[in-house]
Amino acid sequence: MKEQKLIHEGLITESLPNGMFWVRLDNEDLVLGYVSGRIRRSFIRILPGDRVKIEVSRYDSTRGRIIYRLRNKDSND
């Protein structure tokens, strides 16, 4: 059976090398996030200040996979 993942929303606080980011979740936890392969293939740019959805394992809540970048409400995209 497949492991259940918890999906949270958060804010990118710092960019690290190799597609890694520090993400502050809405519940104030700090998680080390890496970019999923689909986002990497689509050349989606993630910058500090962006809101993202992150998938966190229930066994290791200190790291997770960034699966979606949420659109900013004030941008013209």
Curated annotation (Swiss-Prot):
Residues 1-71 form the S1-like domain. GO terms for molecular function: ribosome binding; rRNA binding; translation initiation factor activity. PROSITE patterns: S1_IF1_TYPE. It comes from the Eukaryota. Gene3D superfamilies: Nucleic acid-binding proteins (2.40.50.140). The keyword RNA-binding applies. Keywords: Chloroplast, Initiation factor, Plastid, Protein biosynthesis, RNA-binding, rRNA-binding. InterPro entries: NA-bd_OB-fold (IPR012340), RNA-binding_domain_S1_IF1 (IPR006196), S1_domain (IPR003029), TIF_IF1 (IPR004368). GO terms for cellular component: chloroplast; cytosol. It holds the Pfam family eIF-1a. It is found in: Plastid, Chloroplast. Component of the 30S ribosomal translation pre-initiation complex which assembles on the 30S ribosome in the order IF-2 and IF-3, IF-1 and N-formylmethionyl-tRNA(fMet); mRNA recruitment can occur at any time during PIC assembly. One of the essential components for the initiation of protein synthesis. Stabilizes the binding of IF-2 and IF-3 on the 30S subunit to which N-formylmethionyl-tRNA(fMet) subsequently binds. Helps modulate mRNA selection, yielding the 30S pre-initiation complex (PIC). Upon addition of the 50S ribosomal subunit IF-1, IF-2 and IF-3 are released leaving the mature 70S translation initiation complex. Belongs to the IF-1 family. This is Translation initiation factor IF-1, chloroplastic. The gene is infA.
